[in-house]
């Protein structure tokens, strides 16, 4: 079974041809698409897209709801409550995309850690898997995950591009690993090719 676990389907580039994209995916043998929520607004949008296209594509569309580390600075008192409400939708299968990204720091590391831990607590409370993002922050992310792992039902590190040490750290926590297209890139994917 082919499942695309990280579909940024609310992006405006799909505004004109969402139905055709879904048809092509189905025709190519992709049985399930998990639409990624990266902010409160994007989480609302992907849940709405699941409802909008769910009748035409039954049992194909699912969603995550969460706040990406780039958007962690937007976390406020209402954010987690809205995510909790969205997570009650039957199409929602995970909390995230969450984690740490110290590569560009669109949000400060402290803001990212606060948002990450708030979402881990929500996932543990709701007993939903977590959909993780990490870039240049493996040591700290693993440290935080070790604190929460026993309370989480499941987790996947989406779009893994890290080192052997990071990979083994995630596997030691019994996390699933999502492989990115970088594995096919001779310049960026050489180390990743060896790990796969």
PLM regions and their residue ranges:
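Mid-domain alpha/beta scaffold segments of enzyme catalytic cores
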Residues: 1-196
């Amino acid at each position: 079974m082919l499942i695309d676990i990280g579909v940024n389907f609310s992006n405006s580039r799909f505004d004109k041809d969402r139905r055709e994209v879904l048809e092509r995916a189905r025709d190519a043998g992709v049985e399930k698409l998990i639409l990624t929520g990266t902010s409160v607004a994007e989480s609302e949008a992907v849940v709405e897209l699941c409802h909008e296209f769910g009748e035409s594509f039954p049992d194909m569309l699912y969603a995550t709801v969460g706040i990406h580390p780039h958007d962690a600075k937007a976390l406020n008192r209402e954010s987690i409550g809205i995510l909790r409400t969205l997570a009650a939708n039957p199409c929602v299968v995970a909390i995230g995309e969450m984690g740490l990204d110290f590569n560009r720091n669109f949000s400060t590391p402290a803001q990212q850690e606060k948002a990450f831990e708030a979402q881990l607590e929500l996932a543990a409370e709701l007993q939903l898997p977590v959909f993780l993002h990490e870039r240049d922050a493996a040591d700290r992310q693993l440290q935080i995950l070790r604190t929460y792992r026993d309370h989480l039902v499941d987790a996947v590190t989406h779009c893994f591009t890290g080192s052997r040490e990071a990979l083994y750290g995630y596997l030691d926590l019994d996390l699933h690993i999502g492989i990115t297209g970088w594995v096919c890139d001779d310049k960026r994917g050489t180390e990743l090719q060896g790990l796969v």
